[in-house]
């Protein structure tokens, strides 16, 4: 038996042992696995297991607000509008300074009632964690009665409902040291067993306020990618998260389901010249080449995004032109443009004085060739492949990418000087503030390109302080493009947005994962579990 086959057999046996030990599968006489239709085995990718546990007040679920064990006051539904969860109703004052939530009378998985006191406790504890964010404008939290809570704000914050929808809540009585390893809450499931690095078993919460979930037991596998693939091929996994390098792999008895996500491949383009700004941590800032807006515009107009989707992503993706996706309510449709226009890109460069005078294929200006260092995480093969393809495309415009795989520490040290190819994206408009608000330049991973446009800064400030999301959306749209300027390609770009990633799953025939969002949040695999209480086998 060769080594690869031996490893595959070992992987299948290992997963079968894990699952079999949980009573998930039975082996009938014909040798084919028979499925208990009250259970399922799920694999959500190699990074789906939270290292610090399932504690939302420590940052778990903060990207998308999805949790098996807790519930939120509100959540984003399929069309990206706000849907009531534990809150049965809510009101916002006209001045945007008061948010009042009326609560459903619900119970936790341990049978104890969940009240306004637990809501207050959750938000006050979450405010202590820097990973949660956007809670700084809460002045006080008032408990009007056991099932009504009022948030008093220091100033209007149009993003507060997004924060509410992103924060699962915990019961005060159960929140103790080690909570993340044995969580109690109002979510659809309760933890039974967690063997870190291997699997987690959960059972339906019989107190769940939406009704007992269809599936009574779930097993989540936390194994390496090759082990998971072999187990999926053997029929031991019902929902299998498919990485791009396995996108073409066929799994008998399963169907591929793909969903657009807000997660994207993007290249940062530093906008200032070297020495034009000072970093508080003394990191080098500025790039001689990308500080010229002509370079940044040419790259955006000239690359062929669809070819990246077709050739690297196996068709499971879509071109991305900006952080903001067309599906969200704060998207400005005027920022749309046509890419793969190499002639336009060359014209932009020539008009700005970038010309190939020595015939070496690289344009230069004032003695400076258009050589650009592009960093990408050395451990991410897909990013390396994207980097190579956009490098080939940049050559068509006379721009030379110098590819340098780097560790996270090395990237952090040079992120304001060199271009960084990364994964990024969100459904939350707060990310426009993180990426494009001038005063954020140099603060950790915020505004790494040192973008600073006074009109855009003003629009972002107006959007964030608007009394409601509807008014804020108009300012977010102007920040993208107001007819004269903006952070989009039509204005003053500081990023090269490349492609939206699809989340792909091989789902067993006869198994339903329900209706999914039109645009999935950029999460570590858990996005599709937002409606997990409705998952189940066909009758």
Tell me the role of every PLM-derived stretch.
Residues 45-92, 124, 184:
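N-terminal lobe/hinge region of extracytoplasmic solute-binding protein
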Residues 355-426:
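Ligand/substrate-recognition segments at binding pockets and active sites
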